[in-house]
């Protein structure tokens, strides 16, 4: 019984391990946020509930403008129910592959770091 408990505990702990962006440092192509989003980008996505049921989908047109150490992302969303939404991100390029971003309708500050072909 103790062995079963130990195995279950180790299994659960392995699920909680952090993904380390550094593990991707040798992967290519190298992802550079400001290069990728400078200009026009189209994206799409969807929201699911916890049971996997599709709740909403969207398309987004993104215009990225780079000015010195700031990348501005102007996002225009169109949802499948016809709703439209806009968001403007101001992303500071901090150096050493680190970023910090804010948007008026988002509480707090987003932070990120890239390594190789990954961004976390």
Locate predicted features.
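Sec-dependent signal peptide recognition
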Residues: 1-8
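Intrinsically disordered/low-complexity terminal segments and short unstructured peptides
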Residues: 8-10, 40
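C-terminal motif of bacterial Sec signal peptides marking the signal peptidase cleavage site
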Residues: 12-14
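Bacterial signal peptide processing site
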Residues: 16-18
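N-terminal helix-cap/turn-to-beta initiation motif at the start of protein domains
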Residues: 24-40
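Central antiparallel beta-sheet cores of small beta-barrel/beta-sandwich binding domains
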Residues: 44, 48-120
